[in-house]
Amino acid sequence: MRKIRINKYVIMKKLVLLLFIICCAAGIQANHVVFTADKLGIFPNPERGFTDELGGETKLSDSKNHVVKPEEEWFFDLDDEENEDRKTQRLVVLMYYLYNYKTKDLSNKLLQGFDEDMQILRNHGFKCVLRFAYDWNSKNDAELKWVKRHIEQLKPYWKKNADVIYVMETGFVGRWGEWYYSSHFGNETQELNDSRRQVLQAMIDAVPEDRFLLVRYPLIKLSYLGDENPLTAEEAFSSTPRAKIGHHNDAFLNAWGNDGTYGRNGEGPDD
């Protein structure tokens, strides 16, 4: 009677190979996912689209120094019938006028109020275009030392709430924070003098790393950089001033022209 010799090693190799094939097949099946669209309409994006502006004077007498006043929270409730035409809006411009703080530290009440404003945005899926200024109907801004002090106070709050800040505007200087009519930084000029340069540098240092900073006039950026070299693809989205600084055109679609937005000192407003 013939004896059948069984090669244990060959059998083991075949079993291992079989198990490997089974595991691979099971793995492929387990990772097979079918995606089906549940919504075909436009969905809101918190960094795109049209904006509205909320702003106001932060008063020492306020129980809470909010720009988003309790009576204005309806603005963020997009299920409200009054907001039917704004269902997909997720951007808002917030203007903080520090009228009562031109010669003193920002109060803890104001800083807490800012924090709570940011939480309201967060709760409703909004982001903001953020600007601070000292006056809306005159050129009476604050002295340089107070501007720098206020930026220093606000810096940790900006960092903490970077997730709901879309972009920051330099602000602080002049009427509306627009860097033109000013009591302390040169009046009716776009010139980047030493005081303005210090404010811009303080803002560059204070803005959260992954957020951008907008200046009112392109000339301010050109003067700060000292050249007109274009931004390269390699440098874009980095934290360098050339990549980080943009500009906001407050005269966009203005009936009176661009109000000197793209001019240089000595040129007419629409040259």
Regions flagged by a language model, labelled:
Residues L15-C24:
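Sec-dependent N-terminal signal peptides
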Residues K109-F126, A142-E169, L192-A206:
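An active-site-proximal structural segment forming one wall of the substrate-binding cleft
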Residues R2-K3, K8, M12-L15:
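Positively charged n-region of N-terminal signal peptides that target proteins for export
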Residues P70-R86, R90-D135, L144-V147, V207-R211:
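Aromatic-lined substrate-binding rim segments of carbohydrate-active enzymes
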Residues A26-A30:
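Sec/Tat signal peptide C-region and signal peptidase I cleavage site
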Residues Y96-L98, F132-W136, W158, F172-G174, ...:
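Short, flexible loop/turn elements at secondary-structure junctions
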Residues N31-R90, M95:
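Boundary/entry segment of secreted carbohydrate-active catalytic domains
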Residues V167-D271:
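Catalytic-core regions of glycoside hydrolase
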